[in-house]
Amino acid sequence: MAKDMTLLWGSGSPPCWRVMIVLEEKNLQAYNSKLLSFEKGEHKSAEVMSMNPRGQLPSFKHGSKVLNESYAACMYLESQFKSQGNKLIPDCPAEQAMMYQRMFEGLTLAQKMADVIYYSWKVPEAERHDSAVKRNKENLSTELKLWEEYLQKTSGSFVAGKSFSLADVSVFPGVAYLFRFGLTEERYPQLTAYYNSLKERPSIKASWPPTWLESPQGQDMLKDV
């Protein structure tokens, strides 16, 4: 079963991490795992391009089926192995609706986070503007306050109800990334409590980015958000 699965991934990538968390939650740890280096450009290798012509990670293969979008891979795994491991989509219609809502809202959070963190990496120096940096940080702050409210309503343990779900699989890696880049704990107490609670979950600990373990000290880019 898991031996028919291959995951090409990069350390610290939230999309890669999502798939790894689901594989852990569904007791599919025997999959073929291949860690590639973004720094060395290995995500553009022939092996990756043959599975994902976009040259992006993750790239997940189960038998002859290839899924290169992390949300798609996560939903596929839960669908195919519904009765194995931990259930990640609740049966209750109201909880399921909330799970899907928060899951896909996580994409907005990820985009606003990327607008800040990757701005200086993606925008040529001659085209950068302080006003854009300020605006992006303000947009991220507004988004984070929304998630603070969400977590307050759910008592902070999970983003979409009483149990760990695909919504948490989708959102947690991004939250961890935010704190890795210096998000202030005092300013976002609900997100801090959520992060500190879920980082101890076995599936998350088992898939923690190895580069983060090697270099626990992150950056302070988000200290003023």
UniProtKB/Swiss-Prot annotation:
Keywords: Cytoplasm, Transferase. Found in all the tissues examined. Highest values found in liver and in intestinal mucosa. Glutathione binds at residue 18. It is found in: Cytoplasm. InterPro entries: Glutathione-S-Trfase_C-like, Glutathione-S-Trfase_C_sf, Glutathione_S-Trfase, Glutathione_S-Trfase_N, GST_C, Thioredoxin-like_sf. Residues 92-217 form the GST C-terminal domain. It is an enzyme of class 2 (transferase). The keyword Cytoplasm applies. Induction: By epoxides and by antioxidants. It catalyses: RX + glutathione = an S-substituted glutathione + a halide anion + H(+). The keyword Hydrolase does not apply. Residues 3-85 form the GST N-terminal domain. It comes from the Eukaryota. CDD domains: GST_C_family, GST_N_family. Its EC number is 2.5.1.18. GO terms for biological process: glutathione metabolic process; L-phenylalanine catabolic process. One of its GO terms (molecular function) is glutathione transferase activity. GO terms for cellular component: mitochondrion. Conjugation of reduced glutathione to a wide number of exogenous and endogenous hydrophobic electrophiles. Homodimer. Belongs to the GST superfamily. Theta family. This is Glutathione S-transferase A. It comes from Pleuronectes platessa.
